[in-house]
Design a protein with these regions (language model features):
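Expand to "…catalyze enediolate/carbanion chemistry for C-C bond making/breaking, isomerization
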Residues: 1-110
Length: 110
């Protein structure tokens, strides 16, 4: 089972979540986490990068995978350095959009 970490509250409880029996990985939902961090400035709010390090560290201490959805392959090395070992790049819609733009951009003008 993969536990989604998408809020400041989930980041604060990442150690606890990672220790739950049956949880194999912590997976950051970056858009939701960033939105939550902006909406809740009064919480014991870490920066986005600090939150990512907390989640990756919690997963590592529990012997679990740490995952995240990235927008671009250029972000892979940076997130591996933070401790993420389950990396997804882009989304199905994003990949289809890029393919569509590549095809239509290569088509000759009428």
């Amino acid at each position: 089972m993969v536990a989604q970490i998408e809020s400041a509250a989930a980041v604060r409880r990442a150690d606890e979540i990672a220790r739950v029996e049956g949880v194999d990985a912590l997976f950051v939902g970056p858009a939701d986490l960033q939105l939550d961090l902006r909406m809740r400035p009064d919480l014991e709010n870490c920066s986005y990068a600090e939150c990512l390090k907390v989640v990756a560290g919690s997963a590592a201490r529990a012997g679990k995978a740490a995952g995240i959805l990235l927008r671009d392959v250029a972000e892979i090395a940076q997130h591996r350095e933070m401790g993420f070992n389950m990396l997804a790049v882009d989304s199905d819609l994003g990949i289809l959009r890029k393919a569509y733009l590549a095809v239509t951009g290569a088509a000759p003008a009428p």
